[in-house]
């Protein structure tokens, strides 16, 4: 069981896919069709991995910002069984490493086409 959260603030619709561990159902895909920003797990093991995440993102063309999450960082122990964000990033186009753990967004500041934004861990 997984919970998907959707938020809308000041005209920007955000979707957080939680600990998604399987492909979206047709019903979920339809419900999530309109979004501006999507947070996607990419680390595998506990969630979908890089390939599944990339395929999922390709099915969400209206998401203008994709933010990968639930991946290995240098702050996790080496024995933690999830992958880094690199395999996902190599599979995607328009990847930006933000260099911060925070971004400020508005409807007018969203990119015109889909971009992947890799944030630093907090």
PLM segments and residue spans:
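Conserved strand-to-helix beginnings and helix N-cap segments that scaffold or border functional pockets
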Residues: 26-29, 50-53, 78-82
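Binuclear metal-ion centers of metallo-dependent hydrolases, dominated by the metallo-beta-lactamase
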Residues: 65-122
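Proline-aspartate-enriched helix->loop->beta-strand connector
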Residues: 34-40, 44, 50-71
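Core dinuclear metal-dependent hydrolase active-site scaffold
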Residues: 1-33, 37, 45-48, 99-122
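N-terminal start-of-chain detector that recognizes signal peptides
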Residues: 10-12, 39, 89-93
């Amino acid at each position: 069981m997984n919970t998907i959260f959707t938020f809308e603030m000041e005209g920007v619709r955000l979707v957080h896919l939680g600990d998604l561990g399987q492909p979206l159902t047709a019903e979920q895909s339809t419900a999530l069709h309109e979004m501006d920003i999507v947070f996607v797990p990419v680390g595998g093991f506990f969630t979908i991995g890089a390939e599944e995440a990339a395929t999922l993102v390709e099915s969400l063309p209206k998401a203008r910002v994709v933010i990968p999450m639930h991946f290995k960082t240098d702050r996790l122990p080496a024995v933690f069984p999830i992958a880094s964000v690199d395999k996902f990033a190599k599979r995607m186009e328009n990847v930006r490493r933000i260099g911060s753990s925070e971004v400020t967004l508005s409807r007018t500041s969203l990119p015109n086409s889909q971009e992947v934004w890799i944030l630093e861990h907090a």
